[in-house]
């Protein structure tokens, strides 16, 4: 992965009337998917030696699709985008496009440095992805003009619609939100900060039709609060290992079954967050471990992430059993 420099002058294809039409169609598909189900962020499968296990990824993604998600986001944070080289990324996104076969939108991850973001955007476009989630950069702080400028430049280099992601060092001001919403091809914002005061200001400032997503860690915890400020759609890490639990929560929330929502939060989601917070990186490591406990061929995480300790794995096993029992008992 290269330094954050713009060395490729032919990284994209620009925008135009055909792009505008395609973007509108993707937005409508995303909007429909958001209303229908949770957003799936599949894991990327690896062999024990750390190499890509594409067959394992395909098998895992099939279980995700069978649960009826609103959209699929391969090679994003949960999919360990940070660790994938260009060829691995191409294989993962291509497999996701082939398996979904148009059933739901495929939104591939890209981001970090400018040159890397542009190259991966081209790969995703060539693979047939529907849109891109622009993951935050790291290590360097950037002013608002820089955050907006990165999206402007990326939008010039790809026909794919872009969803900005604010998390970590990336936080958009209200004025920046207005600016990025005017960029052709930028269609939405995923929020991982959980600053609901700021988020409410952003949703009020956005033009009609601009998409917002709850991207908080274990988003179900704050799903009701996000919905109250106009952001009901959310990503679900739990869906990656227990779509039954994620689906039951989503249905209870959608249908206004407050007692069922609170029971799942109290007995499964809150303990899961407490377990997740024990060790940095468990936001991915625990999810993969839980998927392995269910017989999914997802393999280990890649460094610098580490797999859960024996004690934490035992707690995860017990908690997973509790969650599945809750769903099996119809809450």
From Swiss-Prot:
Residues 1-23 are annotated as: Disordered. Pathway: Carbohydrate acid metabolism; D-glucarate degradation; 2,5-dioxopentanoate from D-glucarate: step 2/2. Pfam families: DHDPS. It is an enzyme of class 4 (lyase). Keywords: Lyase. It comes from Streptomyces avermitilis (strain ATCC 31267 / DSM 46492 / JCM 5070 / NBRC 14893 / NCIMB 12804 / NRRL 8165 / MA-4680). It catalyses: 5-dehydro-4-deoxy-D-glucarate + H(+) = 2,5-dioxopentanoate + CO2 + H2O. This is Probable 5-dehydro-4-deoxyglucarate dehydratase 2. GO terms for biological process: D-glucarate catabolic process. InterPro entries: Aldolase_TIM, DapA-like, Dehydro-deoxyglucarate_dehyd. GO terms for molecular function: 4-hydroxy-tetrahydrodipicolinate synthase activity; 5-dehydro-4-deoxyglucarate dehydratase activity.
């Amino acid at each position: 992965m290269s330094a954050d420099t713009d060395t490729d002058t032919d990284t994209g294809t620009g925008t135009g009337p055909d792009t505008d039409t395609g973007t509108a169609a993707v937005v409508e598909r995303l909007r429909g998917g958001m209303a229908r189900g949770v957003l799936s962020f599949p894991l990327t499968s690896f062999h024990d030696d750390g190499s890509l296990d594409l067959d394992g990824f395909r098998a895992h993604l099939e279980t995700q699709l069978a649960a009826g998600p609103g959209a699929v986001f391969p090679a994003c944070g949960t999919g360990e985008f940070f660790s994938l080289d260009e060829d691995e990324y191409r294989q993962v996104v291509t497999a996701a496009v082939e398996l979904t076969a148009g059933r739901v939108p495929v939104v591939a991850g890209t981001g970090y440095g400018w040159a890397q973001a542009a190259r991966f955007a081209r790969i995703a476009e060539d693979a047939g992805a529907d849109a891109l989630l622009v993951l935050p950069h790291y290590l360097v702080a950037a002013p608002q003009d820089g955050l907006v400028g990165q999206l402007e430049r990326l939008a010039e280099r790809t026909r794919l619609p872009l969803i900005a992601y604010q998390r970590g060092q990336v936080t958009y001001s209200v004025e920046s939100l207005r600016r990025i919403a005017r960029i052709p091809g930028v269609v939405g914002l995923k929020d991982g900060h959980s600053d609901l005061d700021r988020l409410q200001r952003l949703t009020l400032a956005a033009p009609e039709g601009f998409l917002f997503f709850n991207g908080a860690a274990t988003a179900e915890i704050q799903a009701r609060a996000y919905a109250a400020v106009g952001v009901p759609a959310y990503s679900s890490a739990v869906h990656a290992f227990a779509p039954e639990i994620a689906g039951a929560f989503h249905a209870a929330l959608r249908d206004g079954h407050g007692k069922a929502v609170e029971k799942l939060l109290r007995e499964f989601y809150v303990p899961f967050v407490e377990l997740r917070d024990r060790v940095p990186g468990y936001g991915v490591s625990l999810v993969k471990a839980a998927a392995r406990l269910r017989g999914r061929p997802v393999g280990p995480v890649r460094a610098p992430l580490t797999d859960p300790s024996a004690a934490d794995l035992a707690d995860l096993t017990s908690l997973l059993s509790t969650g599945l029992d809750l769903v099996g008992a119809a809450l």
